[in-house]
């Protein structure tokens, strides 16, 4: 079975680095499924659930992403995400609370920097909620 190297990195940390047999990335054009030896492309990442199929793993590795850039080479996929969180680190109640706090931050922003930070936090919370919804809807 063919494999490819995958790197998922946020501005704060490396989220995933390893091999995968398939990856689905939410892009501005829609979800993009990538197998090893894919044609080289670049795309903008939109918020949603990034899904990795790892050889020998029963479940997909799920990462909530909100924005960023995708680079695909035949043997390597790199995702530079604005915000990325592994599904194991997510919690529904915390994500909902973060969404409410970000929405309040948007309405109370005093300047452009505060507004941008609140929008980034809102996107991260929505990405986590979408990923948690995906997990719930695909439980076996």
Swiss-Prot record:
GO terms for molecular function: ATP binding; proton-transporting ATP synthase activity, rotational mechanism. The keyword Cell membrane applies. The keyword Membrane applies. Keywords: ATP synthesis, Cell inner membrane, Cell membrane, CF(1), Hydrogen ion transport, Ion transport, Membrane, Transport. It is found in: Cell inner membrane. GO terms for cellular component: plasma membrane; proton-transporting ATP synthase complex. InterPro entries: ATP_F1_dsu/esu_C_sf, ATP_synth_F1_dsu/esu, ATP_synth_F1_dsu/esu_N, ATP_synth_F1_esu_C, ATPsynth_dsu/esu_N. CDD domains: F1-ATPase_delta. It is a peripheral membrane protein. Pfam families: ATP-synt_DE (PF00401), ATP-synt_DE_N (PF02823). NCBIfam families: ATP_synt_epsi, PRK00571.1-4. F-type ATPases have 2 components, CF(1) - the catalytic core - and CF(0) - the membrane proton channel. CF(1) has five subunits: alpha(3), beta(3), gamma(1), delta(1), epsilon(1). CF(0) has three main subunits: a, b and c. Produces ATP from ADP in the presence of a proton gradient across the membrane. Belongs to the ATPase epsilon chain family. This is ATP synthase epsilon chain. It comes from Neisseria meningitidis serogroup A / serotype 4A (strain DSM 15465 / Z2491). The lineage of its organism: Bacteria, Pseudomonadati, Pseudomonadota, Betaproteobacteria, Neisseriales. The gene is atpC.
């Amino acid at each position: 079975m063919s494999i490819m190297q995958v790197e998922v990195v946020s501005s704060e940390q490396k989220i995933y680095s390893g091999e995968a047999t398939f990856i689905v990335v939410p892009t501005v054009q829609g979800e993009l499924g990538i197998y090893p030896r894919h044609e080289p492309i670049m795309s903008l990442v939109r918020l949603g659930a990034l899904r990795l199929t790892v050889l020998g793993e029963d479940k997909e590795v799920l990462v909530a992403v909100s924005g960023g850039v995708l680079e695909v080479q035949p043997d390597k996929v790199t995702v530079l995400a604005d915000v990325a969180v592994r599904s194991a680190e997510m919690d529904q109640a915390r994500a909902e609370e973060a969404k409410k706090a970000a929405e309040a931050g948007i309405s109370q922003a005093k300047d452009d920097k505060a507004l941008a930070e609140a929008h980034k936090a809102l996107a991260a919370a929505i990405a986590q909620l979408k990923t948690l919804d995906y997990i719930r809807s695909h439980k076996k």
